[in-house]
Amino acid sequence: MASDFLPVRRALLSVSDKTGLIDLARALVARNVELLSTGGTAKAIREAGLPVKDVAELTGFPEMMDGRVKTLHPLVHGGLLGRAGVDEAVMAEHGIVPIDLLVLNLYPFESVTVKADCTLADAVENIDIGGPAMLRSAAKNFARVAVATDPAQYADLLAELEVNDGQLSAAKRFALSVAAFNRVAQYDAAISNYLSAVADSSEAVPTRSPFPAQINSNFVKVMDLRYGENPHQSGAFYRDLYPVPGTLATFQQLQGKELSYNNLADADAAWECVRQFDAPACVIVKHANPCGVAVGAGCGDAYELAYATDPTSAFGGILAFNKTLDAATAKAILDRQFVEVLIAPDYEAGALEYATRKANVRVLKIPHGNGLNNYDTKRIGSGLLMQSADNRSMSLGELSVVTQRAPNEAELGDLLFAWRVAKYVKSNAIVYAKDSRTIGVGAGQMSRVVSAKIAALKAEEAKLTVAGSVMASDAFFPFRDGIDAAAAAGIKAVIQPGGSMRDGEVIAAADEHGIAMVFTGVRHFRH
């Protein structure tokens, strides 16, 4: 087994991203490390006044085919793969010199192919061949060789060389090896995903299928979780390699206990719901369902109205705001109720200071961003369900009035508010709302009319008046009984997708009760 610490005497540098290259090369030269390099990397090092030897000089074989072949040579791979204490004789016989450090990043395939005008030819030319081969050779031989794949690794690498008099530890070499294999896997996955989605290879800029023949996913571990969905289950949180700006995965935890699986699942539901509103809004979630949502003049006003919907369920809930959380609102929340997680795009200093008095409360900051997830996925037994994300919004102009009475301006505003909330309630979903606040929420029932009754019951428990409210349903009413129940509760307007074979009966029921009803033509099932 190789020594724990091994010196770096010779390094091969070949990078597409030249960030930090010259500083790294200069530091290595200062330690009398011999530099080998290729193409543009060698040119950059040479122009910085540093000594460097071209790989072509090492191999005696020129770069060819516009740089496609330059490092695919036994003198390169033998120098990376040669084992200490095993291969010295054969290396000496064939004139192979050991390479102790490989610094390499790959052709920018990912950044090139995300461009809308990327041609298939451009994509193919940015598939690196020699780079991944060298990374694999160096990473496999971590017992002797170190490999760096990212400029972010340079500082730590140089720091260890400084502390250990020009040597790298076995632990550092192994960690760098794992990172290199991960990078190669990510790179190959990106190539596979791109090519698998090409619908017609004869097109210069190919049409790409939204559901390719094969999917390769890459997620990076962020943290171990307190536990899974239940305490007897373990859990961890992984982030997409390229997270969408503004989504939950970009959060920063400012304080609080370890997060659990349920914390993050509920936080995602709360955050996705609240970020669809422009005015100050508060969403309170319990077991992945909004139990109170409101828009107000500020965070404090929105919180008071959302909390009033269902104070019982709000206990131990997840609270999300779409504006900077002020100190007064933070104090009002934490003095009143037990909170699992607070979420906001930012916090006033006073809000954070007050939160420290409740040290167990998890405080998450999610930077503003308008990005939307393009897909939703769900694991089933030995399989994956994949669909385009439900990012469909609704405007007033898209609503179809189907009853004799049209909703008035105030009702229209409340209908759109309730519709936005219903999208994030588990099916069957019913939402009662008035004045841009929820009055009652019925979630997750097998019968739609039962969900409507639960929404009314919740309003009664909270001592809120349903009369004059509007109702949103995530899917059509199969029978008129849902409208009859709404009328009995005092509902004045309804928003629903429509599309039932009994729409005529449902519309007639609304007309009988003087209820205004609009169809969206869009369903929002959520399971």
Swiss-Prot record:
**Coiled coil start-end:** none
Q: Which GO terms describe its cellular component?
A: cytosol
For this protein, the record's InterPro entries field holds: AICAR_Tfase_dup_dom_sf (IPR024051), Cytidine_deaminase-like (IPR016193), MGS-like_dom (IPR011607), MGS-like_dom_sf (IPR036914), PurH-like (IPR002695)
Question: Keywords in UniProt for this one?
Answer: Hydrolase, Multifunctional enzyme, Purine biosynthesis, Transferase
Give the record's pathway. Answer: Purine metabolism; IMP biosynthesis via de novo pathway; 5-formamido-1-(5-phospho-D-ribosyl)imidazole-4-carboxamide from 5-amino-1-(5-phospho-D-ribosyl)imidazole-4-carboxamide (10-formyl THF route): step 1/1; Purine metabolism; IMP biosynthesis via de novo pathway; IMP from 5-formamido-1-(5-phospho-D-ribosyl)imidazole-4-carboxamide: step 1/1
Q: Give an example GO molecular function.
A: IMP cyclohydrolase activity
Which EC numbers does the record give? 2.1.2.3, 3.5.4.10
Q: Where is the MGS-like domain?
A: 1-149
Which reaction does this enzyme catalyse, per its entry? Answer: (6R)-10-formyltetrahydrofolate + 5-amino-1-(5-phospho-beta-D-ribosyl)imidazole-4-carboxamide = 5-formamido-1-(5-phospho-D-ribosyl)imidazole-4-carboxamide + (6S)-5,6,7,8-tetrahydrofolate; IMP + H2O = 5-formamido-1-(5-phospho-D-ribosyl)imidazole-4-carboxamide
Question: Which Pfam families does the record cross-reference, listed alphabetically?
Answer: AICARFT_IMPCHas, MGS
Entries under CDD domains matching the protein:
IMPCH
What family does this chain come from, according to its entry? Belongs to the PurH family.
User: What's the record's remark on domains?
Assistant: The IMP cyclohydrolase activity resides in the N-terminal region.
Q: What is this protein called?
A: Bifunctional purine biosynthesis protein PurH
Species name: Xanthomonas euvesicatoria pv. vesicatoria (strain 85-10)
